[in-house]
């Protein structure tokens, strides 16, 4: 699981099966590993793409619009899973940063968990 530092600090305890996963956390400040958590402070996208070429399971990018935008710019996202929280805030941050290229998606699945719609998309043409 790859996540930004803020998402890591906010959500780690609520992630399912967190104890069984390996976490890569993007952080501007270098830190020593903590158990199954490795902090990445250099070129996070390049480090994760190097892992993608190795045998193993899927890489999951969790939370962090800035981090997700970096991976979208690198054309490194195969699937998108987006949860929509049922809260109207009136204003807020964008999900993704401005300036990322358009990506055409196909809705593969829609489920609802505890009142939260979860939309699963694949890239069109891949």
PLM features: residue spans?
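Enzymes that bind and transform nitrogen-containing heteroaromatic metabolites
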Residues: 1-126
């Amino acid at each position: 699981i790859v996540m930004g530092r803020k998402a890591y600090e906010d959500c780690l305890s609520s992630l399912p099966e967190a104890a069984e996963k390996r976490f890569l956390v993007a952080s501007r400040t270098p830190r020593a590993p903590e158990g199954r958590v490795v902090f990445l402070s250099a070129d996070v996208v390049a480090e994760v793409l190097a892992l993608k070429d190795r045998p193993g399971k899927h890489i999951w990018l969790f939370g962090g619009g800035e981090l997700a935008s970096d991976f979208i710019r690198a054309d490194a996202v195969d699937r998108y899973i987006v949860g929509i929280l049922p809260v109207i805030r009136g204003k807020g941050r964008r999900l993704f940063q401005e300036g990322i290229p358009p990506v055409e998606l196909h809705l593969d699945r829609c489920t609802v968990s505890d009142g939260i719609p979860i939309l699963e998309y694949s890239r069109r043409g891949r």
